[in-house]
Design a protein with these regions (language model features):
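Secondary-structure end/capping motifs
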Residues: 222-303
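Bacterial N-terminal signal peptides
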Residues: 9-20
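Ligand-binding clefts/hinges and TM-proximal coupling segments of bilobed small-molecule sensing domains
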Residues: 139-154, 234-265, 307-313, 317-322
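Pocket-lining segment of extracytoplasmic ligand-binding domains
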Residues: 88, 167-258
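Bacterial N-terminal signal peptides that target proteins for export
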Residues: 1-10
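Conserved C-terminal helix/tail region of periplasmic/extracytoplasmic solute-binding proteins
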Residues: 295-334
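Bacterial Sec-exported substrate-binding components of ABC uptake systems
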Residues: 22-28, 329-332
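Short, glycine-/small- and polar/acidic-enriched structural segments
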Residues: 25-175, 179-185, 198-202, 207-208
């Protein structure tokens, strides 16, 4: 009887140790951020630096991978648990056969500007002029197409010249070779310093578009839903922290951008404080817009459905449980 009692005590102790250690174990997670600029990557930096990943049981290793497409490719290859991505890259990865899904969002519109020569007086003046553009299927390409559509023009109304990435596009206009281009906040600032002007502020058009989002694999969702759930919660808290802790946010931006100019970071902070989505819910309408445009040059997109690219169960949970309302100290929405 004594032996039985002793065995029970030992079992209880061992069980307690196992349970206790399991609760303390953090899941090792590898996540790519795709820009070393002070934009949407800040949410990942913040979550790491202020301990939000750790709070939700994630032993996070952040990895810089230059570009959304490369991040998605690494995810599909099994090198990552999550990646930051632009919606277009997630769509392309899925259409190419990748078992991936968008699980949360940071920005649901296009934080782009159409900038050009001072001689361009209005958006209507873009008609017939030359534009420095990116290759089809990139976010910059979609931004150009949607900006034109938003002011009543089409891609056929301009002389599009494929130049490439942001520095090359800006240079083509600054040097006078082409008339206008599409740029993010940093490109806009550079262009304005060189004498270019903002012709269209796309954020003001509020065109739904899946810009920055967190993507994972279908396998991760099926086999480790709690890890995905924790990631989504951490990203939601990172957005809240960004919006409410300006000084900390800017200090972390300075760290990851290697001491970028404070004034420039202030401007970026103000812009993204408005752009970042509180409930981290992906924009289904934005994904639909992307598929409609992509269908013009990609037959696979014409047959695809929005639900093929997104899994909203985790962001739905945030809404239903009142997680977001609690963060922002407001009455629960239903």
């Amino acid at each position: 009887m004594r032996n039985s009692g002793l065995q029970l005590v030992i079992i209880a102790i061992v069980f307690g140790i196992v349970v206790g250690s399991t609760r303390g174990v953090e899941a090792k997670v590898y996540t790519a951020y795709i820009s070393d600029g002070p934009d949407t990557s800040i949410a990942y930096w913040l979550a790491k630096e202020v301990g939000l990943f750790k709070k939700h049981g994630l032993d996070m290793e952040l990895i810089f991978i230059d570009g959304s497409s490369r991040g998605v490719q690494s995810l599909i290859a099994g090198d990552l648990t999550f990646t930051d991505a632009v919606g277009t890259s997630a769509i392309n990865g899925r259409l190419a056969g990748g078992d991936i899904a968008i699980v949360s969002s940071l920005v649901n519109t296009l934080p782009y500007y159409i900038i050009g020569k001072s001689a361009i007086k209005s958006p209507e003046d873009l008609k017939g002029r030359s534009a420095a553009v990116h290759i089809p299927g990139t976010s910059a390409d979609f931004a150009m197409r949607l900006a034109l559509k938003g002011v009543g023009l089409s891609y056929k109304d301009i002389q599009a010249v494929t130049v490439g990435g942001a520095p090359a596009r800006n240079a083509a206009v600054i040097t006078g070779r082409l008339d206008f281009t599409v740029a993010t906040d940093s490109g806009k600032i550079e262009g304005e310093k060189a004498g270019l002007k903002v012709i269209i502020d796309m954020a003001k058009l509020k065109i739904p578009f899946q810009f920055s989002c967190t993507v994972t694999t279908g396998r991760m969702i099926r086999q480790n839903p709690d890890v995905v759930r924790s990631m989504v919660k951490a990203m939601a808290e990172a957005v809240h922290y960004y919006k409410t802790q300006k000084e900390d946010a800017i200090k972390i931006m300075q760290k990851y951008t290697r001491g970028q100019n404070r004034a420039a970071l202030e401007g970026t902070y103000v812009a993204y404080r408005e752009l970042l989505v509180e409930d981290v819910y992906p924009t289904l309408e934005g994904l639909k817009n992307t598929l409609e445009i992509q269908a013009s040059f990609d037959p696979k997109a014409a047959k695809a459905k929005v639900d093929d690219f997104v899994d909203v169960r985790f962001v739905d949970e945030l809404r239903k449980t009142g997680f977001i309302d609690l963060l922002y100290n407001r009455e629960r929405t239903r």
